[in-house]
Swiss-Prot record:
Name of protein: Large ribosomal subunit protein bL33c
GO biological process: translation
NCBIfam families linked: PRK00504.1, PRK00595.1, rpmG_bact
Organism: Cyanidioschyzon merolae (strain NIES-3377 / 10D) (Unicellular red alga)
Keywords: Chloroplast, Plastid, Ribonucleoprotein, Ribosomal protein
UniProt GO molecular function: structural constituent of ribosome
Domain of life the protein comes from: Eukaryota
Cellular compartments annotated: Plastid, Chloroplast
Family stated for the protein in its record: Belongs to the bacterial ribosomal protein bL33 family.
Chief location bin: plastid
Gene3D superfamilies, A to Z: Ribosomal protein L33
One term under GO cellular component: ribonucleoprotein complex
Gene name of this polypeptide: rpl33
Length: 62
């Protein structure tokens, strides 16, 4: 049987504080999935960033 087309897609979340601060050693990214039907807009989650050392907002990137 053929597999049905899934509405879940893989996305990357990037730390906004690391991106704005140029003197950081790197940029933190998380990989997760989301359901395109339920959340069509870009996802924003508050997650821990090891480069910043505290919880920051992570936004979805392409």
């Amino acid at each position: 049987m053929a597999k049905s087309k899934s509405s879940r897609v893989g996305i990357s979340l990037e730390c906004t504080a690391c991106r704005a601060n140029a003197n950081q050693p790197g940029v933190n990214r998380y990989r997760t999935t989301k359901n395109k039907k339920n959340t069509p807009n870009r996802l924003e989650l508050k997650k821990f960033c090891p480069y910043c050392g505290h919880h920051t907002i992570h936004r979805e990137i392409k």
